[in-house]
């Protein structure tokens, strides 16, 4: 996908896309570095966009693992369909419907590229509640943002929130690595 197509889609609905450029390979690396890819894993990606993070996950994943990638933008979904990998399951649906596609506590990792800062608090809490249901206890929710706006919300939902940063993205980005849901999240 060309940069111009990405910008065109982003400008149509910036609150949905949340970015002006696709994620850099450096950001994709930061998002996937905390993941233990050994063995059979079930990984969920929220907001697959044009597939830059999707490709990095697939590159690192084992042959028996599966990646469920959610994307609601039809242009991005068409681009994602060009990725020919039997481990990839593309889902053109809201992330709130994750439980239609996975079993309770089946997911090893959730990697989110959703523009949380653009969503209202109720929707964010709904997303995190569904992540709590889908994620195996003790496993990771990894989210990137361009600001620290939702740090407090994530700390409310998770006992451990580690923050990483990369300048090598346009714009530079924060990566939250979250573990162990709190009692408040139930």
Predicted regions and their residues:
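Class I SAM-dependent methyltransferase Rossmann-like catalytic core
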Residues: 3-35
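Conserved class I S-adenosyl-L-methionine
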Residues: 40-49
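Glycine-rich SAM-binding Motif I of class I
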Residues: 51-55
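Conserved SAM/SAH-binding beta-strand->alpha-helix loop
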Residues: 73-75
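Conserved SAM-binding strand-loop segment of SAM-dependent methyltransferases
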Residues: 86-95
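A short acidic, Gly/Pro-enriched loop at the edge of an enzyme's catalytic core
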Residues: 100-110
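A short glycine-rich, Lys/Arg-flanked "PGG" loop and its adjoining helix->strand segment in the class I
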Residues: 125-137
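Conserved beta-strand signature within the Rossmann-like core of class I S-adenosyl-L-methionine
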Residues: 137-145
